[in-house]
Amino acid sequence: MKEEIIKIIAGVAEVPEESINLKTNLIADLDLESLDLVTLVSEIENKYQLEIPDKEIKKIQTVEDIVNFLSSHV
């Protein structure tokens, strides 16, 4: 799952997958803006056929946050 998430993030952020790890901060390290985050969440929701509640989206700061959320909901 981690590798799939990193691949999605790399595509949205337009960076090499190798530059992303669990501790990578989506905003500080990858310079993602709000529209990028919406795109990222949408792609993850489509891939895993689930809806991430807004309150959970606001908590997501790192790749690890996404992986942890999905691990407990997929």
Which role does the model predict for each range below?
Residues 1-18, 71-73:
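Thiotemplate assembly-line natural product biosynthesis machinery
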Residues 13-31, 48-59:
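Phosphopantetheine carrier-protein modules
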Residues 25, 35, 62-65:
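Residue-level recognition of oxygen-bearing side chains
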Residues 38:
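Conserved catalytic core of two-component sensor histidine kinases
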